Every structure is written in structure tokens, then in C-alpha cells.
Amino acid sequence: MGLILDSSVLVTAERQGQNARQMLTSVAQRVSETEIAISVVTLIELAHGAARANTSERKAKRQKFIEELQTAMPIHPVTVPVALRAGKIDGENRARGVQVALPDLLIGVTALELGYSVGTSNLRDFQRVPGLTVVRL
């Protein structure tokens, strides 16, 4: 089984001064999953954060972290089955008055489609994705 990391885990690691490989080693020591990966949506969130950095030093540090991630672990795309399943879950959730942020929903459904769990420090949204196993990191 595998684990898709949410951006919350990556942002925390980057802020603590870890590079991508150190973060991956740290996570691997805490979980038993055979593959640790991210969704392309997480890459979008990280790129957004780098673009919004308030100093050129912070921007460069974040961009370096993003570059390292691209060679440190698999990055899974949003596929047509992921998009359709996410749309179905979003519609059903909203009909019940439950809302999940679209990036988190796409990350969660990517994990579901792969038979993986999601590793995050943001349990709230991911616990609203039916059938998803969420691991607190």
C-alpha cells in the first residue's frame, strides 16, 4: 500500500529546514507504506506558495524544495477517473451540506483510486472523503 502526502506535511518539513530527501526519510520511518508519493495538485499548491513568498531568499528556498521533490518521489496526475470520482463525491457531499476544498478532494480521490492512504496534518477535510484512510503526520 502507498501513501500520498498532503502539502501540509511538505510545508512543515520545508519550514523546518529539511530538504525533500530528509523529509521523505523522516516520513518513511513513521509509516509502513511501500510507496510515498504526492499528487500533482500538491505540486500546484507548493508552486503557489513559492510564488507568494515575501522574500527572494524564501522563494528560492521553496523553489529548490519543489525541484528536489520532483526527483525524490513519484508524482501522480489527476486522471479522468479521479476527476469523475471527485465530482461525484463533491456533489454527494454538498447535497448533505458537507464541503471539502477541491485541492484536498482531488488529492484524497487520487489516493483512493490508487488504493493508498493520505498522510497529512490537516485531518478535517480528508476525513470528509468517504472511504479514504487518513494518516496523521
Residue ranges and their predicted role:
Residues 1-2, 108-137:
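Acidic, PIN/NYN-like endoribonuclease modules and their adjacent C-terminal/linker elements
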Residues 39-41, 78-80, 121, 137:
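Conserved beta-strand termini and adjacent loop/short-helix elements that scaffold enzyme active sites
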Residues 48-51, 72-119:
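Active-site neighborhoods of divalent-metal-dependent phosphate/nucleic-acid chemistry enzymes
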Residues 8, 47, 64, 105-106, ...:
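Active-site phosphate/pyrophosphate-handling residues
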Residues 10, 43-46, 83, 126:
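A generic structural signal for short hydrophobic patches within well-formed alpha-helices
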Residues 5-6, 39, 100-101, 122:
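Histidine- and aromatic-rich ligand-binding microenvironments
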Residues 1-38, 51-67:
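Short, well-structured N-terminal submotif of metal-dependent ribonuclease cores
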Residues 12-14, 23, 49, 86, ...:
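Residues that scaffold the ATP/ADP-binding catalytic core of kinase and kinase-like folds
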